[in-house]
Amino acid sequence: MALPRPLLLELLLYGSCFICGIITAASVTISQGSFDGKCMLYGSVRLNSSTIDVLSFSSLSLCYFVSAISVCVAVFCFSLTLYWIYIAFVDGEIKREKLWMNVTLGLSGVFLFFLLVTGCILKIGRDRLCDSLLHTVSNITRCEEAQNKSWRSPINASQFYTRLHSAETAVWVNFFFWMIIVVLVLIQRHKGSEIRPGTEDPSAPPSETEPFFNRPGRP
């Protein structure tokens, strides 16, 4: 059974949000691993001879929070996509009740809030780390140039800026997609409430609205 266009577009957005969530979680986790398990958001560095060393770092729960939010959004999007595919190709009846659209809107608001918080954490946390690098390490004018510098073993910071930037970009793209999802659900909810039980559908042909038995003629 063919899916309605608004729902089809909504499912495509869910798939895109799933990919964004996986990118964010993977980028933050790999970046954390390259710093020997430390969460370098809001972190600072120092020079130890000619190598860069970690001076301070954030609580591990901060990076875990960012990854957990991204994974939760990805799992929800994946599950919802599978559900509607099952309904379309197995059940064959596409029906969205107003109650569940309200639930979707509520969850969308929750996800938008946490994605906004996550994006701000990644943005400000990365900027704090970059400010420390620019003030500590000489001969660099951009944060990404520190990727090519020598770091104290076992730190492997060759792609730290690229990974953190990818994580932040994926979060903001995810946030934008969820705003579109909210608009699509609101449109479908409004269209669903236009025709209420007990009212005639103006687009229905006259034969569908006439009584089953003809009324007797007037005397």
Curated annotation (Swiss-Prot):
The chain crosses the membrane at residues 6-26, 69-89, 105-125, 167-187. It is a multi-pass membrane protein. It is found in: Membrane. It comes from the Eukaryota. Keywords: Membrane, Transmembrane, Transmembrane helix. One of its GO terms (cellular component) is membrane. InterPro entries: TMEM179B (IPR029776). Residues 195-219 are annotated as: Disordered. Belongs to the TMEM179 family. This is Transmembrane protein 179B. It comes from Danio rerio (Zebrafish). The gene is tmem179b.
